[in-house]
Swiss-Prot record:
Pathway, per record: Amino-acid biosynthesis; L-proline biosynthesis; L-proline from L-glutamate 5-semialdehyde: step 1/1
Cross-referenced PANTHER family: PYRROLINE-5-CARBOXYLATE REDUCTASE, PYRROLINE-5-CARBOXYLATE REDUCTASE 2
Subcellular location: Cytoplasm; Mitochondrion
Pfam family membership, one: P5CR_dimer
Keyword Heme assigned: no
Region (Disordered) residue spans: 296-320
Cited function: Oxidoreductase that catalyzes the last step in proline biosynthesis, which corresponds to the reduction of pyrroline-5-carboxylate to L-proline using NAD(P)H. At physiologic concentrations, has higher specific activity in the presence of NADH. Involved in cellular response to oxidative stress. In some cell types, such as erythrocytes, its primary function may be the generation of NADP(+).
Organism: Pongo abelii (Sumatran orangutan)
Protein name, as recorded: Pyrroline-5-carboxylate reductase 2
Keywords: Acetylation, Amino-acid biosynthesis, Cytoplasm, Mitochondrion, NADP, Oxidoreductase, Phosphoprotein, Proline biosynthesis
Length: 320
């Protein structure tokens, strides 16, 4: 089995690193395409021994499972470009927030009568094999196709199948969730520094507290509130701290953050449906930095195939 990534940004790097670390794929079985070869993530993939190319078509040609790992509003143009190269045996996995199975199928069916499409939402902790992934299968995807993706994603964390209408909410919760955790950790570390702790120690303590709390919850059958109550002694420091968080609307802020991410996910789908980004903008900018200043509706013509750039590790060479 070979895996390809259209896009060589943070998600592609995280998944490639996770797959190789888990031992489910060798680096030479992975290919990623990017119009820009100087990105830090591209350099990291190159060091891992992943095959790299500027041609999306080349990536399709060398893949069995194809991950669309680009921004949502770029997806329609990518599908126009690679549609003729997608074969009946390909499993096309959309990782873009808000991009529906039907929208991908509609594009591909102009070239292929029964494209096998799976919609997936994962997160960056896959890089350390602690990701959270859900997926939904499309009209023509077989049960075995879903099982193959689940096997891949389970090697880098938790993975389960859901109904597609739940995926936007998953995006707001676990898709964006690591960013919430990092922001909370940054604030906790600031609090530690304010009270006299060295920065490095404050970060380590905060990270371990979050890691330990998450593991306690996952390993138990208790509700989070029960575990929270177990930390609070009557009249103690923790209950006073929680009162302060409650008075600042801590819970409401998190609930609103999940909702805001979910709503934005649906807005991104609307943008993708309307194809608001011009091919000119697509060519001028990096995949993760498309300019939206002067959007126009037009059709992207397939680009000419680029040269496949490969890197092979010498015998006895170091692995990243």
């Amino acid at each position: 089995m070979s895996v390809g990534f259209i896009g060589a940004g943070q998600l592609a790097y995280a998944l490639a690193r996770g797959f190789t670390a888990a031992g489910i794929l060798s680096a030479h079985k992975i290919i990623a395409s990017s119009p820009e070869m100087n990105l830090p993530t591209v350099s990291a993939l190159r060091k891992m021994g992943v095959n790299l190319t500027r041609s999306n078509k080349e990536t399709v040609k060398h893949s069995d499972v194809l991950f669309l790992a680009v921004k949502p509003h770029i997806i329609p143009f990518i599908l126009d470009e690679i549609g003729a190269d997608v074969q009946a045996g390909h499993i096309v996995v959309s990782c873009a927030a808000g991009v529906t199975i039907s929208s991908v199928e509609k594009k591909l069916m102009a070239f292929q009568p029964a494209p096998k499409v799976i919609r997936c939402m994962t997160n960056t902790p896959v890089v350390v094999q602690e990701g959270a992934t859900v997926y939904a299968t499309g009209t023509h995807a077989l049960v075995e196709d879903g099982q193959l993706l689940e096997q891949l994603m389970s090697s880098v964390g938790f993975c389960t199948e859901v109904e597609e209408d739940l995926i936007d909410a998953v995006t707001g919760l676990s898709g964006s969730g690591p960013a919430y955790a990092f922001m909370a950790l940054d604030a906790l570390a600031d609090g530690g520094v304010k009270m006299g702790l060295p920065r490095r120690l404050a970060i380590q303590l905060g990270a371990q507290a979050l890691l330990g709390a998450a593991k306690m919850l996952l390993d138990s059958e208790q509700h989070p509130c029960q575990l929270k109550d177990n930390v609070c002694s009557p009249g103690g420091a923790t209950i006073h701290a929680l009162h302060f968080l409650e008075s600042g609307g801590f819970r409401s802020l998190l609930i609103n953050a999940v909702e805001a991410s979910c709503i934005r996910t649906r807005e991104l789908q609307s943008m993708a449906d309307q194809e608001k980004i011009s091919p000119a903008a697509l060519k001028k900018t990096l995949l993760d930095r498309v300019k939206l200043e002067s959007p126009t509706v037009s059709t992207l013509t397939p680009s000419s195939p680029g040269k496949l750039l490969t890197r092979s590790l010498a015998l006895g060479g170091k692995k990243d």
